[in-house]
Amino acid sequence: MKFLDEAKVYIRSGDGGNGCVAFRREKYIEFGGPSGGNGGRGGDVVIEVADGLNTLIDYRYQQHFKAQKGTNGMGKDRHGANGKDIVLKVPRGTQIFDEDRETLLHDFTELGERFVLAEGGNGGFGNAHFKSSTNRAPRNANPGQEGEERWIWLRLKLIADAGLVGLPNAGKSTFLSKVSAAKPKIADYPFTTLHPQLGVVNVDGREFVLADIPGLIEGAHEGAGLGDRFLGHVERCRVLLHLIDATCEHAGKAYKTVRGELDAYAETLSDKVEIVALNKIDAVEPEELKKQRDRLKRAAKKTPLLMSGVTGQGVPEALRALVAVIGEAPVSDKAKAAADVEPWSPLTG
């Protein structure tokens, strides 16, 4: 399934039904009095977090969603039926923004969470409602209230326990495929990964969700390369695993490039726990490896882990370092569900 983390949609709640003007007409009852029923209430537009979703791709193919109108009132004091709500299914981690793309309306973090985004209009009163001691035969009724309409933005920030960051070709996808059942595209050219990938990792009987974020280059926060639009997905991660390619020209400069982009994107990423690892150590000579490790240690101001996603050397140590930060509690079913991609229509009801 294709990945989409942002979508613009139009929503409209249902109009209320009109009230009815009617009078009783029965045998032997000369003045039956008013009997017009009230109109039904319009349906609401509801956003709900669904299990098994991690993309907004369905909203690329359908952008307009309208709840059902309430039916009109009828004679014999019959009220109109309420309109059905329309429920839009979204993945956990979705944020709802107003049309200006800045005003946050709601942030969904729990499975099954529901939010009424637009309430249906109230039904109009029938003439029976206006009967009084001074007005025994009212001939007026109210129209139904109009529903609400608006354009909104859906923005997805995947919820994972740990995030993989680094320059393009740092070996992030290889690492993810090695430690989980995820099957990201792997090739020897930059920007092989074009959208985030999720995998469930099991280490020492404990599980956590790992997100592979497309590679960053210098100037990403200004739109270079794939830009920084995917960095929102690591904002919710508890820990970052920063992979540096040992075969690159200068490991210290590579680290500072990505670190600079993270800091430029959001201050919250500066506060994230970061584990630094020098990857692809199987592809360099011992002498060069020592130089790269020293360069990286000076730049990161911490001793980097040494590992190879291809041979598996150092991988268990990296995973245990992640688990130590994430905590000993096993990941919940809700988090694991975020790593499964299941087809789902956004529209129910």
UniProtKB/Swiss-Prot annotation:
Domain of life of the organism encoding this protein: Bacteria
EC nos: 3.6.5.-
Domain Obg: 1-159
Binding residues for GTP: 166-173, 191-195, 212-215, 279-282, 308-310
Entry keyword Hydrolase: yes
Binding site for Mg(2+): 173, 193
Listed SUPFAM superfamilies: Obg GTP-binding protein N-terminal domain, P-loop containing nucleoside triphosphate hydrolases
Domain OBG-type G as annotated: residue spans: 160-327
GO cellular component terms given for this protein: cytoplasm
GO biological process, any: ribosome biogenesis
Cofactor(s) in the UniProt record: Mg(2+)
Enzyme class, UniProt record, top EC level: hydrolase
Location of the protein in the cell: Cytoplasm
A Pfam family that the UniProt record links to this protein: MMR_HSR1
Record keywords: Cytoplasm, GTP-binding, Hydrolase, Magnesium, Metal-binding, Nucleotide-binding
Gene Ontology MF terms in the entry: GTP binding; GTPase activity; magnesium ion binding
Keyword GTP-binding (UniProt): yes
Family note: Belongs to the TRAFAC class OBG-HflX-like GTPase superfamily. OBG GTPase family.
Protein role: An essential GTPase which binds GTP, GDP and possibly (p)ppGpp with moderate affinity, with high nucleotide exchange rates and a fairly low GTP hydrolysis rate. Plays a role in control of the cell cycle, stress response, ribosome biogenesis and in those bacteria that undergo differentiation, in morphogenesis control.
Subunit structure: Monomer.
Protein name: GTPase Obg
Organism: Rhodopseudomonas palustris (strain BisA53)
Gene for this chain: obg
